[in-house]
Structure formats: C-alpha cells, structure tokens
Amino acid sequence: MVLGTAVALLTSFYGPGFNGNLTANGEIFNQNAATAAHKTLPFGTTLKVCYKGCETVRINDRGPFIGGRQLDISLGTAVRIGLYNRGVDYTTVTRLS
C-alpha cells in the first residue's frame, strides 16, 4: 500500500469475543479504540478508513483470516464510520504513515 494513495479494501470488523485479549503486537485489544488488523503492514502504521464517515486507525494486530478480506477494523471504528450494520464491504483506505 503506497503512502498517500487511496485504495479499496474489503473490510470487516471484530470486537466481541476479542475485547481484552492480546493483539499480535502485545497490546490489550480495546474494541472501541481506533485500531485495525492487517496481514502485512507494519505495526504502528496509520490508515484513514472511509465508508459513510472516516476515521484514522493504527495497525496493532494481524488479520483478517477469512478469505478475501483485507482489513479488520475495531467494532468502535465500524460503528463510527457506518460499516457496523453492513458488516463487510469495501472501504476507501489511505495510508498516512
């Protein structure tokens, strides 16, 4: 993912069942925080994720692990950008750092 370039990623969310568990980088997962999981982006990378609204998230976990999905955002971010009711859909994602 090139810095500053917007791409469409198939995005889902996670939270229930994972809240309070350790993320891949050793942090405690907070389902309301502005965080996300990606398979290869370095921990600490920031992304602007847009659906109906936008939010800046920080990569602190690995995933998603369901075929075809490219980004997992926290439950809180899904609610704030309007993806929660849809569940899975393409979002516009821009790498900020």
Cite the ranges covered by each PLM segment.
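Secreted/periplasmic proteins
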Residues: V2-S97
